[in-house]
From Swiss-Prot:
GO biological process, one term: L-arginine biosynthetic process
Reaction equation(s) it catalyzes: [amino-group carrier protein]-C-terminal-N-(1-carboxy-5-oxopentan-1-yl)-L-glutamine + phosphate + NADP(+) = [amino-group carrier protein]-C-terminal-N-(1-carboxy-5-phosphooxy-5-oxopentan-1-yl)-L-glutamine + NADPH + H(+)
Pfam hit, one: Semialdhyde_dhC_1
Name this polypeptide is given: Putative [LysW]-L-2-aminoadipate 6-phosphate reductase
Domain of life according to the entry: Bacteria
Keyword Oxidoreductase: yes
Functional pathway: Amino-acid biosynthesis; L-lysine biosynthesis via AAA pathway; L-lysine from L-alpha-aminoadipate (Thermus route): step 3/5
Amino acid sequence: MVVSVAILGGSGYTGGELLRLLLSHPEVEVKQVTSRSRAGKFVHTVHPNLRKRTALKFVPPEALEPVDLLFACLPHGETAPIVDRLLELAPIVIDLSADFRLRDPAAYEQWYHWTHPRPDLLAQAVYGLPELHREEIRNARYIACPGCNSTTVILGLAPLFRAGLIDLDLPVTVECKVGSSGAGGEAGPASHHPERSGVIRPFKPGGHRHTAEVLQELTVCGRTPSLGLSVTSVEAVRGILATAHLFPKQPLTDRDLWQVYRAAYGQEPFIRLVKEASGIHRYPEPKILAGSNYCDIGWELDELPGGRQRLVVMSAIDNLMKGAAGQAVQAMNIRLGFPETLGLEFPGLHPL
């Protein structure tokens, strides 16, 4: 039986990417897509790549009707106040906002400067990162999709922390280089072409909100790493490259790292280990992931003076796919018992 779905907040880049995927999904029928500002307009007037793919028009949020599964793509702070209404509309909700990603309401105060209106529901929401929470997703009623930067960082580092290889007495430093689509579809001074073109601009050198998710997921045996996350805007539309600098407890070899990552991700359909001896694609590169749901992970060991060893881990995704819409569809497939890769097989383009 075909599953009926709707998208709440479908006029942004994430909503458009989600609609693109769902329109080609063989087990899904998209019933409605909402937009308050564009109600009554054909969706292809906002998402021109979908011309002749659908005759759907945007409807106002108040016009939403019950469906089997609801995707919520609202800005931060707009989902939590209406969560009861969403759960009335659908027995399964997949939320792409940040409103239910964190389990601790105090973390919202610290990182978002926001008092969560429904702290009673935080423990019920499942963090929708399949590689870490697949079994929880299978039975979840409310799935909170991770942020794009946090997805990239967590997938790159989780196997190392879970294996106990990292010295938690030393700081972990991560920088994410991000494309412009991560800022959303609304124009502003920073996205004006003369200001954005050719840029390498520090966006959030410290205090990025996605740090909270990374700390939550990398806390092992009650111990939270001393991790700092910096985000830099670069000349690209799609993609994130996270580069993490860590210090192992004991010296590691490439073979050790291959074993750890293969044990964690060897059966994962959307994780690829990229560590080549030669060629221009020796390490993860976001450009070749555009439009795909893959996360590519690689590393390099750096022998420092004095006998200390530094581990550099690189992970890359398409922020609109594995960092948002693709991951949401992957979670939907798991939750509904479909093959996990259904509708997500596109490998990306090369060259691009």
